[in-house]
């Protein structure tokens, strides 16, 4: 291109730029809008179901998984339709399509439960938050925690990138040993539920047709306008974060709860008996009806210990196993010789568990 042509073009662009400056007027200091200074909710793409960026588990076929003894409530029948006492439900596993209750089956979480009404708000100290827009009863399903399902390697890479950017809001929830739900970029309102050391909801891990999904359920009655919270049990990544939940007994820092101390075998039996006495007013097992066990009682003979072991049958327990996918189990049998309980887990596998060596609790 001739030099004269280049100069002509530059002069023309300069004239256009000068004209724009005259139209703009005097320069002013740039300030962010007030709504940005107060804290804008982090942008994300709304989704209804998890999006898998890793290999998705195969769907369960009709004959896979665990089964319950419930059956359809036909006229004149004393059978019970799947409900709170369904073995599948007690193990946080949905019934399969081969359930004898058919269309009457009530153990179809997520599929049959409607998301509760809730509203996104800005809090004074905790950024964005969620309040209930309707009354919620204890035990009711509130919302599913959804996002991108990634593996541990991808999770670690994303965490380091966020750390280098100085971000402090994490939306990660581990569902299995090598599978994490990341709601940073895609999710729903559940990502805005804040932490509390005394929460009114909890996360529950359910197996739906072979897929592990996370639901948020009310642990007590929640009033309209009340903040929804759950215990993050946050695994620290970087500097400590202060807790501003304001609950009685606040731990002051976001972090994992201290684990329960390991207890001796006899004490483990006593603890089971104590919790059973509070949660199971009547025991129907092997003909034993309303046979209570006193808390703190010393087990001096095998018959007394056997009574406790029989009363444990049918109880759902939660085991703290960071490196295992098997956390929830149904106690099915007690072996007096080995002093171990036979526990069936949500994937249908049965193990003999020494409860004196496990960190556990009754669900």
UniProtKB/Swiss-Prot annotation:
<dbReference type="InterPro" id="IPR046341">
    <property type="entry name" value="SET_dom_sf"/>
</dbReference>
<dbReference type="InterPro" id="IPR050777">
    <property type="entry name" value="SET2_Histone-Lys_MeTrsfase"/>
</dbReference>
<keyword id="KW-0808">Transferase</keyword>
<dbReference type="GO" id="GO:0005783">
    <property type="term" value="C:endoplasmic reticulum"/>
</dbReference>
<dbReference type="GO" id="GO:0009506">
    <property type="term" value="C:plasmodesma"/>
</dbReference>
<feature type="domain" description="AWS">
    <location>
        <begin position="63"/>
        <end position="114"/>
    </location>
</feature>
<keyword id="KW-0137">Centromere</keyword>
<feature type="domain" description="SET">
    <location>
        <begin position="116"/>
        <end position="233"/>
    </location>
</feature>
<keyword id="KW-0156">Chromatin regulator</keyword>
<dbReference type="GO" id="GO:0005634">
    <property type="term" value="C:nucleus"/>
</dbReference>
<feature type="domain" description="Post-SET">
    <location>
        <begin position="239"/>
        <end position="255"/>
    </location>
</feature>
<dbReference type="InterPro" id="IPR025787">
    <property type="entry name" value="Hist-Lys_N-MeTrfase_SET2_plant"/>
</dbReference>
<dbReference type="InterPro" id="IPR006560">
    <property type="entry name" value="AWS_dom"/>
</dbReference>
<dbReference type="InterPro" id="IPR047893">
    <property type="entry name" value="ASHR3-like_SET"/>
</dbReference>
<keyword id="KW-0539">Nucleus</keyword>
<keyword id="KW-0158">Chromosome</keyword>
<dbReference type="InterPro" id="IPR001214">
    <property type="entry name" value="SET_dom"/>
</dbReference>
<dbReference type="InterPro" id="IPR003616">
    <property type="entry name" value="Post-SET_dom"/>
</dbReference>
<keyword id="KW-0949">S-adenosyl-L-methionine</keyword>
<dbReference type="Pfam" id="PF00856">
    <property type="entry name" value="SET"/>
</dbReference>
<dbReference type="GO" id="GO:0042054">
    <property type="term" value="F:histone methyltransferase activity"/>
</dbReference>
<dbReference type="GO" id="GO:0032259">
    <property type="term" value="P:methylation"/>
</dbReference>
<protein>
    <recommendedName>
        <fullName>Histone-lysine N-methyltransferase ASHH3</fullName>
        <ecNumber>2.1.1.-</ecNumber>
    </recommendedName>
</protein>
<dbReference type="GO" id="GO:0000775">
    <property type="term" value="C:chromosome, centromeric region"/>
</dbReference>
<dbReference type="GO" id="GO:0016279">
    <property type="term" value="F:protein-lysine N-methyltransferase activity"/>
</dbReference>
<comment type="similarity">
    <text>Belongs to the class V-like SAM-binding methyltransferase superfamily. Histone-lysine methyltransferase family. SET2 subfamily.</text>
</comment>
<keyword id="KW-0489">Methyltransferase</keyword>
<comment type="function">
    <text>Histone methyltransferase.</text>
</comment>
